[in-house]
Amino acid sequence: MKIITVYGSSKVRPGDADYEASVKVGRKLAEAGYAVMTGGYYGVMEAISKGADEAGGHVIGVITDQIGKRYNLEPNAYIKELVNYTELRDRLLYMVQKADGYVAMPGGVGTLHEIAETWELMRIGGVQTQPFTCYGPLWETVIHALQGSPYLGEGYEGMLTISHSPDDVIENLTV
């Protein structure tokens, strides 16, 4: 089964538009036959896990002591397979290396770091290039600003797509 790593904010809550969109994305991913892998905690991570679980999908949570112990967090209730790392950087590398594709849902600096790290690893050949889509207007603005700047060197073009709906996510992962 192919695994899609999903990045996103821990801040969104049930009822928030981004949380509900994430539930739909998780459901669509599971219905398309993908396992989902997230950072294992709350917000987008929980919403993706919930949607995938409700659709009968396999949910992998990759947690880290560095976050869990600092903020006294437990993994979300939808995880079927739990992977634990001590350091955040090891968690991210695992999530990048084990994935067959990536989705970045709305998020902040942590999600931006995950996008940048994954994008750069694909560009330099540190991991195999896989489909990678960023969801929503925030990432569309950020990605287009980077792509239009003189600071982005060669090799970045065409690696990321922008999705505006859960259906777009599936379409962009299968092209």
Walk through the language-model features, giving the residues of each.
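Glycine-rich beta-alpha loop segments
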Residues: 1-60
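Short glycine-rich anion-binding loops that position phosphate/pyrophosphate groups of nucleotides
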Residues: 9-12, 65-67, 107-110
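Glycine-rich, charge-decorated loop segments at or immediately adjacent to ligand/cofactor-binding or catalytic sites
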Residues: 42-47, 139-149
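Acidic/glycine-enriched connector segments
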Residues: 43-104
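Short, acidic/small-residue loops that bind anionic groups at enzyme active sites
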Residues: 63-65, 105, 119-143, 155-158
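Active-site/ligand-binding-proximal alpha/beta "capping" segment
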Residues: 89-126, 133
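A charged, well-structured terminal subsegment
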Residues: 94-97, 101, 153-175
